[in-house]
Amino acid sequence: MLRVYNTLSRSLEVFEPVEEGRVSIYVCGPTVYDYSHVGHARTYVAFDVIKRYLRLRGYDVVHVQNITDIDDKIINRARDEGRDWREIVDEYTKDYLEALQKLRVLVDVHPRVTEHISEIIDFVQKLIDSGHAYVAPSGSVYFDVDTYPDYGRLSGRLDKKMWSQEEFASEKKNPYDFALWKARKPGEPYWDSPWGPGRPGWHIECSVMSSKYLGRRFDIHGGGTDLIFPHHENERAQSEALFGEKPWVKYWMHTGMLQVRGEKMSKSLKNIVPLRDLFRSYDPLVVRLWLATAHYRTVLQFSDEVLEQAKSNLQRLRGAVQLLKNLAKEVEPEGRLSDWELGVFREMLDARREFYASMDDDFNASGAFAAVMKLTGLVYSQVSAKPTYLLVLRALRLFEEFNRVLGVLDEDLALGAAEVLPVDELLDLIVEVRAKLREQKNYELADYIRSKLSSLGVQLMDQGEKTRWILTRA
């Protein structure tokens, strides 16, 4: 039974989607005014893992992640650099999409705000017509928070003194009302509307795009904890006010923040790490493994030490799979299982049960990865020592199953056992030559071959009279 933590109820709840067999997910994407950084990746990878696990569980999942391509930050950056705002958007959208591809984050729909202006205007007009919003003298439109009695429950801010919105304007009825539509200012991009030229406020866009692609009620709304207030609180208010659906979102899920040396990663502290810079030092799949194997709600520490550990873990995983592929060339189907083989097989099944039990517990990827490493240990300690057809193929299938969630290994694991690539044949030949050198007691040259292969990322494993190789470089 899958249970998830709901920010709204502040408790674990049994996961039951709105529509049986189908899961709808909306994740707040980036405002594209700067390079994507590792803090963004924390959220995107976490929800990619969640989505992949739900698919593994048999759900039909639709994952929407928006792109905010009009915002104060974009306008300010364009003004500071003397560029057209659309150039800023194009540059950083490209960077964002390239980062997702390298991290193997799979998104079904990437809606952009500027492609949904007519829908946003329609949404705002309906809020005005229903008495939940008002037009100010400037032509800006604000949501009247007092018309939504449940405001503050998502964030736990039940005192009105805690509601003050970032943008205070004397034309608002209350300081905590928030902008749905911003009246045009000189030199800024704008669109025509019934209230005059202007552009959308920040919060309205996600309500509009999520409802367009997922419906008036959907399952999971995700983002970082920094978005709970005011962004998600405001989204919830305007959507439930208009649709009358409660809850509008069934499960609110939020990722923990990243820290650097105990401090929050933020632009104000100048400790942001752009992904494009990080990828120069680490394989993007090392970064993915680090992020994918942490519980999504934990506060995550960023350091070279944790990335080096992830690199080592990825090397060990890749090595285990490569070892299994090599072993698959040696083994043949057998008859009756030995007691020893049955015991190892049961340990593999235990690892599988632990993987699912962890993921069913609020997507505890940390616990699930411990099960993956348990299987990895079995491959090195048991299967490689006494390989059999059943154990080798079962282990490969389990890695393929786990990788459907982790997404860090080759996609062709299950079929890879039968493949023999030219590099495999070359390494097999080198190992064979080294074995003959050892038979001739030419240990100096045999050790030289081992040392050179190791420097190239190939580890040799001497087990009795048999030597096998694995790739270790990540």
Swiss-Prot record:
Catalysed transformations (reactions): tRNA(Cys) + L-cysteine + ATP = L-cysteinyl-tRNA(Cys) + AMP + diphosphate
Annotated motif 'KMSKS' region, positions: 264-268
Keyword Transcription attached: no
Free-text remark on how the cofactor is bound: Binds 1 zinc ion per subunit.
Binding sites annotated in the UniProt record for Zn(2+): C28, C206, H231, E235
Xref: SUPFAM superfamilies: Anticodon-binding domain of a subclass of class I aminoacyl-tRNA synthetases, Nucleotidylyl transferase
Cofactor requirement: Zn(2+)
GO biological process entries: cysteinyl-tRNA aminoacylation
Motif ('HIGH' region): 30-40
Binding-site residues, ATP: K267
Pfam families according to UniProt: DALR_2, tRNA-synt_1e
Segments crossing the lipid bilayer: none
One GO CC term, this protein: cytoplasm
Keywords: Aminoacyl-tRNA synthetase, ATP-binding, Cytoplasm, Ligase, Metal-binding, Nucleotide-binding, Protein biosynthesis, Zinc
Localization of this protein: Cytoplasm
Gene3D superfamilies attached to this UniProt entry: Cysteine-tRNA ligase, C-terminal anti-codon recognition domain, HUPs
The organism's place on the tree of life at top rank: Archaea
Predominant subcellular localization, coarse grouping: cytoplasm
NCBIfam families documented for this protein: cysS
Family affiliation: Belongs to the class-I aminoacyl-tRNA synthetase family.
The protein's name in its UniProt record: Cysteine--tRNA ligase
Organism: Thermofilum pendens (strain DSM 2475 / Hrk 5)
Gene that this polypeptide is encoded by: cysS
